[in-house]
Amino acid sequence: GVTVAITGGSVYVRVGNGTNYRIITTVKAGMTFDHIATARNGWNAIVINGQVGWVSGKYSKVV
């Protein structure tokens, strides 16, 4: 897939693929972003505000 759709209600975007990484911003369900990569643990890398951010695979899907 080329885009990542946010499926959770309100999801943190982080600088890395885990909850221990710093939060960049919050995104909402229904928003879509360019998909860069998916980590082994299921987190998806997206482009947001010109930078790379990561969202949990529990709350996002590649479409």
For every predicted segment, state its role.
Residues T3-T7, D34-I36:
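A structural signal for short, hydrophobic beta-strand segments that form beta-sheets
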Residues G1-V4, Y59-V63:
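Intrinsically disordered, low-complexity Ser/Thr-rich linker and spacer segments
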